[in-house]
Amino acid sequence: MIIGAITAFFAASVGLFQNDIKKVIAYSTMSQLGMMVIAVGLSQYNVALMHLVLHATYKAGLFLAAGSVLHAMGDQQDFRRYGGLVQILPLTYTVMLIASLSLAALPWLSGYYSKDLIIELAYGSYSFSSYLVYWLSVIAACFTMLYSVKLIYLTFLSYAQGPKGNYEKAHESPWVMTIPLIILALLSVYLGYITKDFFVGLGSQGLGNSIFIHPNHIILIDTEFGLPIFNKLLPLILSIIFAIFSLYLFEKNPFFFIFSSKISKNIYRFFNQRYWFELIYNKSIIKGVLYLGYITNTVLDRGILEFIGPRGAAQAVYKISIYFASFDSGSIARYGFVMYSGLLLILLLWLLIPNIDLF
């Protein structure tokens, strides 16, 4: 449960500061996987499976809509180079808007039925750790709304920021791409309402015969009827407030956060570079492993092992053969020297080893 909350918060905070359209959606996926882990940690496996199924629809719609935008804009992935595409890609805009609102758990869209329920279940466990998970999930939900607004605004609603040539060639995707977009948009709206009773309905067995939840962990009823209405509506209220605030700031200056102060630049860099985890990981672990590999390759593989292995043996045989080949020089004096040297060696062996039988 704690791991899921940290994952959801981490991925949402990192995704908020990304500028690549595919990275934003990818970190959003990571954040929603954290929400599923929260549900699993609460032993609400049916809710986790419900969120998995519903999340698949609107996230697939987001990825396909992003692909439609990339197809129109010449594979440009930085949405700071987009803007004004609502007039060129109205269908893609509609699908991405619906999928983003479902991702942000706007009421009565598919994401609302599972995502908000997971947050409510965290509070309904009534323990310190579950309260911590609840607040981390609420913050992650607010971040989700923020980067959804950022993605929609900078891609479709702001002024054109890209090269003129991209806009001249931009067009809506063909029907083989738009038909799946329409289907996923409809699922992002209706699938949650259709499947809610199957997954978490009080009067339906649903997955009761395939998923076992211990009676001590059944908190769905207490959460549904005993949770204060304020705690149920808090994620939605904060998300709407943050969405309005971000729209106002984006309308004034889309890049206000970067250029406001040096501190804000450092904060932006910190989250954009994923808490510097990759930098620390590369310098502390990867660099050491690569250096160890270099030493191993230089000293062992190309050093000791080569010296005593194939290269060393080949050189030894070659040098020995060259040495013995030097005796074949045609010189009678050298032949005599070799012959008498061999005779002396035999005599020494006979004298030093009395029991040896040489003759």
Task: Show which residues each predicted segment covers.
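Hydrophobic, aromatic-rich alpha-helical transmembrane segments
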Residues: Y45-A48, L52, Y131, W135, ...
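Alpha-helical transmembrane segments and their helix-start/interface "positive-inside/aromatic belt" motifs
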Residues: Q87-M96, H171-L186, R334-M339
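Hydrophobic alpha-helical membrane-insertion segments
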Residues: M96-A104, P180-F199, R274, L290-T296
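Hydrophobic alpha-helical transmembrane segments of multi-pass integral membrane proteins
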Residues: L97, T144, L184-Y190, F242, ...
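Aromatic-capped, Gly/Pro-kinked transmembrane alpha-helices
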Residues: G203-L233, I237, L249-F359
